[in-house]
Swiss-Prot record:
Residues 80-83 are annotated as: Involved in Mg(2+) ion dislocation from EF-Tu. It is found in: Cytoplasm. Keywords: Cytoplasm, Elongation factor, Protein biosynthesis. It comes from Chlamydia abortus (strain DSM 27085 / S26/3). PANTHER family: ELONGATION FACTOR TS, ELONGATION FACTOR TS, MITOCHONDRIAL. This is Elongation factor Ts. Associates with the EF-Tu.GDP complex and induces the exchange of GDP to GTP. It remains bound to the aminoacyl-tRNA.EF-Tu.GTP complex up to the GTP hydrolysis stage on the ribosome.
Length: 282
């Protein structure tokens, strides 16, 4: 039977901002004494971390990993670039990638409540608080992504600027071409496509582009206008659609052409299943 009331537990959580499990542990260790429990949590480096939660986080790092468990991408933000390159912070981020892969989780709130792979006695959120205490800055897990591992696919990851920008490319129909997938990921970081192909461009974005083009060519015959719009839309698609872009390592071929060559070599259909492009703060 617990030696503390629910009201005391509630007060401890309000005063410290620490998770339920650790608050229960603190009160149990301190025989239900609220003040001693606060001190107990402070010694663990948990209580004071909540005071940093309001601080703005514009810097950080994006980390990604792919293995037999799937593919994980995480973005974690801090206040300064100095801490973003701190070894303790980087270790915490690497641990988060492992947590996402181990638990196959795709939601930040759910991840925060799970046991940390770095310290099973702490939840991910509690370890975040401990790490905040160590580095002296607010830490915010901005977003995470988990992609399940499936058969006959290749995943390529490219990181630029020490984790400021990361791209992931998933190729289907090919199981041993991580180098090709990585080349495409490198291209994505350089060319910054917004969409996979023409078909994935939203109707509203396409309508806006047509409106902009039309406003520039008023007063011409409709047949001429239609031809100009078609040509300019082709340029638009080349700018924003991955498969329409000229390959950064060989501009004589598009990404779609590169995929077609891989399909021909393999004797089966190879496709870009999906891609991710994350930039810090974007």
């Amino acid at each position: 039977m617990s030696n503390f009331s629910m009201e005391t537990l509630k007060l401890l959580r309000q005063q410290t901002g620490v998770g339920l499990t650790k608050c229960k542990e603190a009160l149990a260790e301190c025989n239900g004494n609220l003040e001693e429990a606060v001190v107990y949590l402070r010694k663990l480096g948990l209580a004071s971390a909540s005071k940093k939660e309001h601080r703005e986080t514009k810097e950080g790092v994006i980390a990604a990993k792919s293995d037999s468990r799937g593919t994980a991408v995480v973005e974690v933000n801090v206040e300064t670039d100095f801490v973003a390159n701190n070894a303790v912070f980087r270790t915490f981020v690497d641990g988060l990638v492992e947590d996402v892969l181990n638990h196959k989780v795709d939601n930040v709130d759910a991840l925060l409540q799970l046991p940390s792979s770095q310290d099973a006695s702490l939840t991910v959120d509690e370890l975040r608080a401990v790490t905040m205490q160590t580095v002296g800055e607010n830490i915010r897990i901005n977003r995470i992504k988990y992609l399940p591992k499936t058969t006959n696919e290749s995943v390529g990851i490219y990181s630029h600027g020490n984790g400021k920008t990361v791209s992931v490319t998933v190729l289907s129909g090919i199981s041993d071409e991580e180098s090709l997938a990585k080349d495409i990921s490198m291209h994505i970081v350089a060319a910054q496509p917004l969409f996979l192909n023409k078909e994935s461009v939203p109707e509203d974005a396409l309508a806006r582009e047509k409106e902009v083009i039309s406003s520039q060519i008023q007063g011409k015959p409709q047949a001429v206008i239609d031809k100009i719009i078609s040509g300019k839309l082709g340029t638009f698609f080349q700018d924003v659609c991955l498969l329409e872009q000229a390959f950064i390592k060989n501009p004589d071929i598009t990404i779609q052409g590169l995929i077609n060559e891989a399909s021909k070599t393999r004797g089966n259909s190879v496709e870009v299943k999906e891609f991710i492009l994350w930039k810090i703060g974007a």
